[in-house]
């Protein structure tokens, strides 16, 4: 998993509340358990005017020019600004996979759905909760200033605006540790690989009848 320490990136404003996981990555694309291949279909039903299908050539599809991620000024955005209850709906880890592959490193919103919130941390995506007032002000700032960027410092738990104002956010200490060190569930387990091997060796020696090759 990619570590997250500090990131400065262009902000794209998605001014919609209750964005659910089927809107983030529609159900017809959930045909793989690999973590790649979902970015091109992020927000597919909003980015395009037709109904997308797996393995389709998106370059030939009609684009919805009104959707924010299709605006020239937001190309290359890596910070998504959203409204409350982002990531609600059915549980699908493909949602943070799609956001990550598209290029987003962090999502800022007043609140998140619990399962999406947890899945994001496990996939190197940093969800940041700010107050309604802080998010409202950021939407105004982004709209008024093309090329608007934010700097996110996970160690300091701070979001710094271009004008120098710092917005602080809370994060669970364990999740912070994992993100700073790029540790997903597998990475955490591998940290104890020596202890696991020692246990397996002792277990095999003490109960050899449980093992076919003993």
Swiss-Prot record:
GO cellular component terms, semicolon-separated: 3-isopropylmalate dehydratase complex
SUPFAM superfamilies assigned to the protein according to its UniProt record, in alphabetical order: LeuD/IlvD-like
GO molecular function: 3-isopropylmalate dehydratase activity
Pathway(s) where this gene product acts: Amino-acid biosynthesis; L-leucine biosynthesis; L-leucine from 3-methyl-2-oxobutanoate: step 2/4
InterPro entries tied to this protein: 3-IsopropMal_deHydase_ssu (IPR004431), Aconitase/3IPM_dehydase_swvl (IPR015928), AconitaseA/IPMdHydase_ssu_swvl (IPR000573), IPMI_Swivel (IPR033940), LeuD (IPR050075)
One BP annotation, GO: L-leucine biosynthetic process
Keywords, ordered alphabetically: Amino-acid biosynthesis, Branched-chain amino acid biosynthesis, Leucine biosynthesis, Lyase
Top EC class, one word: lyase
Enzyme nomenclature, EC number: 4.2.1.33
Reaction catalysis annotation: (2R,3S)-3-isopropylmalate = (2S)-2-isopropylmalate
One of the Pfam families matching this protein, by short name: Aconitase_C
HAMAP family assigned to the protein according to its UniProt record, in alphabetical order: LeuD_type1
Subunit details: Heterodimer of LeuC and LeuD.
Annotated function: Catalyzes the isomerization between 2-isopropylmalate and 3-isopropylmalate, via the formation of 2-isopropylmaleate.
Family (UniProt): Belongs to the LeuD family. LeuD type 1 subfamily.
Protein name (Swiss-Prot/TrEMBL): 3-isopropylmalate dehydratase small subunit
Organism whose genome encodes this protein: Pseudomonas putida (strain GB-1)
């Amino acid at each position: 998993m990619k570590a997250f320490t500090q990131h400065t990136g262009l902000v794209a404003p998605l001014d919609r509340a209750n964005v659910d996981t089927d809107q983030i990555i529609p159900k017809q694309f959930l045909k793989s358990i690999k973590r790649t291949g979902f970015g091109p279909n992020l927000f597919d039903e909003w980015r395009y005017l037709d109904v997308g299908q797996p393995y389709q050539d998106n370059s030939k599809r009609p684009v919805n020019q009104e959707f924010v991620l299709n605006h020239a000024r937001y190309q290359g955005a890596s910070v998504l600004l959203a409204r409350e209850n982002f990531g609600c709906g059915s549980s699908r880890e493909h949602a943070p996979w799609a956001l990550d592959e598209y290029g987003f490193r962090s999502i800022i919103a007043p609140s998140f759905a619990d399962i999406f919130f947890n899945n994001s941390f496990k996939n190197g995506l940093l969800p940041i909760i700010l107050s309604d007032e802080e998010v409202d002000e950021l939407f105004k700032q982004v709209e008024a200033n093309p090329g608007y960027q934010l700097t996110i410092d996970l160690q300091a738990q701070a979001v710094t605006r271009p004008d120098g104002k710092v917005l602080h956010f809370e994060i669970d200490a364990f999740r912070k540790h994992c993100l700073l060190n790029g540790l997903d569930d597998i990475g955490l387990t591998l940290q104890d690989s020596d202890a696991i091997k020692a246990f397996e060796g002792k277990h095999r020696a003490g109960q050899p009848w449980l093992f076919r090759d003993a």
